[in-house]
Amino acid sequence: MISQSTLFLFILLIIGLIAKNQSLTVAIGVLFLLKFTFLGDKVFPYLQTKGINLGVTVITIAVLVPIATGEIGFKQLGEAAKSYYAWIALASGVAVALLAKGGVQLLTTDPHITTALVFGTIIAVALFNGVAVGPLIGAGIAYAVMSIIQMFK
């Protein structure tokens, strides 16, 4: 008999293939590989607790590559500082990092929220070609909204 988790992943795989979403398809493929080689029992807990940090590290490395290659240097930084778009980007970066901080706090204190956030991310990735950074930022937005609601209670 097929387990509920296998069926769920299979449905998500079909959605990923139909939506032509490579990230979702590869992620599910890796999860199936781990699950069916029985490595999942050892690897899944690690991925569940450290996966977000691992992903953020990989994204950070990718973002810093142009600095490492010399493509972006102090000259480009100075030129960017003259652009109001750069200042908007800077403020956005600060806002997103602060939202993500609240998201980590929310996911730690209220883990059942994770289910709704994961579903929202899956919908965005599969149907709208979104990028799967949604749970952390989504949790941050949820945390901010919940904090505002608490202020008015």
From Swiss-Prot:
Subcellular location per UniProt equals: Cell membrane
The residues that cross the membrane are: 8-28, 54-74, 87-107, 117-137
Pfam families from the entry? DUF441
Highest taxon, organism lineage: Bacteria
Look up and give the membrane topology term.
Answer: Multi-pass membrane protein
Q: Which UniProt keywords apply?
A: Cell membrane, Membrane, Transmembrane, Transmembrane helix
Name the protein family.
Belongs to the UPF0756 family.
Species this chain originates from: Bacillus cereus (strain ATCC 14579 / DSM 31 / CCUG 7414 / JCM 2152 / NBRC 15305 / NCIMB 9373 / NCTC 2599 / NRRL B-3711)
Name of the featured protein: UPF0756 membrane protein BC_4596
A GO cellular component annotation here is: plasma membrane
